[in-house]
């Protein structure tokens, strides 16, 4: 080993450019490969990560009935229930004490969504894409989806005078005029743009209605004023496994003729994951292509670097160094370059991680920034080192054998030459 180390130190100044080329190629192209595979995994898991960050419900049931929160909490498998109510409680203030009825609201494209006991604030939490979340204890703060803001022509930071009415008032024939006095007058502050956790990926048909969302502090006083469409978000003891049993219990407990609509979170999750799968597959394939490219080109550079050592290896063989020592002498620098390049590849892969995930989840992804995907980093490092080191060892041994054969041929030629000279002298 001392011979190999001595040979490496004395020849490094002539070969450092070869080693640097191997390091940069393996590090940069291999890093792109590792980064791409990591991005593929991060993209594919992005919706599950986002959904988990919202404290999701396991199922929802939409009912047109008086508030049934306590009744729906009774089934043994139900751990917690929170409620939102679909009701146009508030309208922009118009002239002379009458509400203004925008076309977006009268058509149903934009509707009010009020949190009753914390739904959308502590469970199925909204993802904020601009501004901030409304304070659930403030009556004069609200948030909207981006589509609702466009429909209404409002923006984050805007103060909107609004009138609020009970269900009974809205059912009066004179509603919409100054004859019906609002139950509450407020200057509402639009503090944020949000995305619901089940609306990150939407089909065209699901884009309406879209929502302006009011706090529990504002919604609670209006909940008991009439019958609304209420959405009950249920968290179950054993997650999606309990959904069929709870559905049966709810259906059995409802009044005859009641209409209901179930919404299962795991179904939505599966649909979204399937929709982003093509992007993650494309990233994974690109990463594999980059990895193969790095290995093939690096293998060629290693072969060229070892070929340049042939002259020195012949000298070492002539000095009596055995074949194994000859091979290790030429491998020391190359193996060091391979390991350094593999480390650099992991560094590049980590540096590229803030570019992922890609796709619709990126805007709401909670864990953006640098990511250390240790399975990808570790496996990538091992593959690069093992594959290139194996190729380097095989090439070095092959060249060492070739050098040994060449040296024996030279020795044989020398012996034959001396023998021929001796015979010539004797003949004379």
Briefly describe each language-model feature range:
Residues 1-295, 299, 304-308, 323-324, ...:
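Membrane transport/envelope proteins' first extracytoplasmic loop
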Residues 313:
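Conserved phosphate/oxyanion-binding catalytic-loop motifs
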Residues 334-342:
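Transmembrane alpha-helices
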Residues 342-353, 357-358, 377-415:
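C-terminal membrane-exit region of the final transmembrane helix in multipass inner-membrane proteins
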Residues 376, 411-428:
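Cytosolic juxtamembrane regulatory segments of multi-pass membrane proteins
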